């Protein structure tokens, strides 16, 4: 038998001959992911455009084009930073929101089941049943508001847990004696707790109003103007900044005037020593000005 002879290979029999063969070379279709712009790249483009606009010999047509490009880059940068901040806040408070939503859902289901059982119960007087049903409806409405609070709280803001106080009370029952021995919470902690509680109550009222108006989705995305009613802080700040500072009078500064003009600066020790005067004559001058200025500022 010659060496070059090769017997024909019989094809291997498979139990599923009609099944199409999957080639390994074909890659799986990639997921469609939106390519977000790079912040550093946008900042670099903004710097380049600003440098180009700073040139005095730039033509008017090119200047208009570059100004439009600059406005577009700045808008893209602001949108990207806002998107990243939103994503960061979602990841940060995801687990807390999940626990609160789970607790609120259980509360809604429990009250709904209790209301249905009470409505089907015929052993109670009609007046008593109506009274209890009204109470359950009020509690169920509050539970629904709490549930919507956990779902539609603005994603771009710091989330305040709605059941944090109850958990702290349950955990703090065994530690009351230790807290009393230590002297109780500090004044700063009480102020922070009061501010957090006030902010949570305000958000609950906002959620209840959005439930009536049907704008819960806008609240979740942060598209509602929540600061419309609370413009007092910004207004007071602008008012304080806009107030012009009054010029200090001669009485407040302690500088004596002659004919409506201020005197010259007090002579220093070096100038007096050059003219032959001793330091004893120059010492009372700053003391007089200091006493007069202090009396002007702290005068009641």
Curated annotation (Swiss-Prot):
Q: Please state where this protein is localized.
A: Nucleus, Nucleolus
Biased composition regions of type Basic and acidic residues, renumbered to the chain: 27-36, 262-275
What is the superkingdom listed in this entry's lineage? Eukaryota
Q: Which Pfam families match?
A: Efg1
**Stretches the record annotates as Disordered:** 1-44, 168-187, 227-300
One biological process GO term for this chain? maturation of SSU-rRNA from tricistronic rRNA transcript (SSU-rRNA, 5.8S rRNA, LSU-rRNA)
Residues folding into a coiled coil are 61-148
Keywords per UniProt: Coiled coil, Nucleus, rRNA processing
Q: What protein family does this chain belong to?
A: Belongs to the EFG1 family.
- Summary of the function given for this chain in its UniProt record: Involved in rRNA processing.
What is the name of this protein? Answer: rRNA-processing protein efg1
